[in-house]
A protein has these predicted regions:
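Conserved HGGG/HGGXW glycine-rich cap/lid loop of the alpha/beta-hydrolase fold
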Residues: 59-104
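Acidic catalytic loop of the alpha/beta-hydrolase fold
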Residues: 265-269
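Short beta-strand/loop motif that positions the catalytic acidic residue
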Residues: 254, 260-262
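Catalytic active-site module of serine/aspartate enzymes centered on a nucleophile-bearing elbow/loop
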Residues: 284-314
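Active-site loop/oxyanion-hole signature of alpha/beta-hydrolase fold enzymes
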Residues: 49-50, 57-59, 99-141
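Alpha/beta-hydrolase fold catalytic core
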Residues: 1-66, 91-92, 132, 313-314
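Flexible "cap/lid" loop of the alpha/beta hydrolase fold
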Residues: 151, 160-188
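Conserved alpha/beta-hydrolase catalytic His-Asp/Glu region
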Residues: 28, 34-35, 174-175, 193-253
Length: 314
């Protein structure tokens, strides 16, 4: 009987230790109003669409016949393109948006985070803004949304830019710590309520090529925006609904001139996938960036912009 008593005490101590760890990592949701002052200054605006208040930035000349639309990746936000938008908006109309489930837009009322739901969202956004044809840019998840939109509605996409894009299986080399937690179904009740800032910092360092580029402000942004009400649950739903690489056969149907950009130190999706895109897309140019990771447009806006400007000028 002594061993049963000892086992009971061990279980109690382990339970107490786990409870203390959960308590230490517990983070309440942030209400939208708590986040606006810091993360939605001008030129941010909100557009009512599909039952959501969609956070977006629409800058530059309104007579631009082919605006540039920027789509971010999973657990990110339009802020990932701030450097690009600021630099390009004097000459081009630039539209960046927080996709459903992320950033200040928050969760989809339907809870549908499949790629086809996102492509329909992008097309409805363009319709609402009265935009007929665009240069469509996407990073990671945003890249797959971009190329699938180009396949679904080729008349709406003049040119395509894919940055470390999802598309091929196996899609993921390594997964940031925050995504690993999100993929653990048995931990959902707990993980919807915890988000250690340290985990966010570790996750960001794993997707940047240079750790020194991961500033305290960037960690704050990813940390606070992922605490927006509903975003943690939306991330878990997206992970459940994701079918990485399931539609890769469709990539051959992309006919638009395409620029593929890839960070050579991307540890999340293999840089080899950049070559795969250009094997399957007939009018394709691949540019890689030494020293950059999974978010090259955010990590070094100036260097990646040079490649983008050259592509747009052709």
């Amino acid at each position: 009987m002594k061993w049963l008593k000892r086992l009971w005490w061990i279980g109690l101590l382990v339970g107490m230790a786990v409870s203390m760890l959960v308590w230490a990592a517990w983070e309440p949701d942030r209400q939208l109003g708590q986040l606006l002052a810091r993360w939605a200054p001008e030129p941010s605006s909100f557009l009512e669409l599909d039952g959501m208040q969609v956070h977006m930035r629409d800058t530059g000349p309104r007579d631009d016949p082919t605006p540039i639309v920027l789509l971010h990746g999973m657990a990110s936000s339009l802020h990932s393109y701030e450097g690009w938008q600021t630099s390009l908006q004097d000459q081009r109309r630039i539209i960046s948006v927080d996709l459903p489930g992320f950033g200040l837009t928050g969760p989809s009322p339907q809870g549908d985070y499949r790629i086809d739901a996102y492509t329909r969202f992008v097309l409805r956004l363009l319709d609402t803004l009265g935009v007929k044809r665009v240069v469509l840019v996407g990073n990671a998840l945003g890249g797959e949304i971009a190329w699938q939109t180009a396949v679904l509605a080729p008349e709406r996409v003049r040119k395509l830019v894919l940055i470390d894009s999802d598309g091929y299986p196996p899609a993921v080399l390594s997964m940031p710590a925050a995504f690993q937690v999100a993929s653990m179904r048995g931990m959902r009740w707990v993980s919807e309520r915890i988000l250690p800032r340290a985990m966010v910092a570790i996750s960001l360092r794993s997707v940047f090529g240079n750790d020194e580029k991961v500033t305290a402000e960037k960690v704050d942004r990813y940390f606070e925006l992922n605490l927006r009400v509903g975003n943690r649950r939306a991330l878990f739903q997206r992970m459940d609904q994701a079918q990485f690489g399931a539609s890769s056969a469709l990539i051959r149907r992309v006919q638009q001139p395409t620029l593929v950009m890839w960070g050579e130190r991307d540890e999340m999706i293999s840089p080899d996938h950049g070559s795969l895109f250009c094997q399957d897309i007939p009018h394709c140019q691949l540019v890689t960036f030494a020293g950059l990771g999974h978010l090259p447009q955010e990590e070094d806006a100036e260097r990646t912009l040079r490649a983008l400007r050259d592509f747009l000028a052709k």
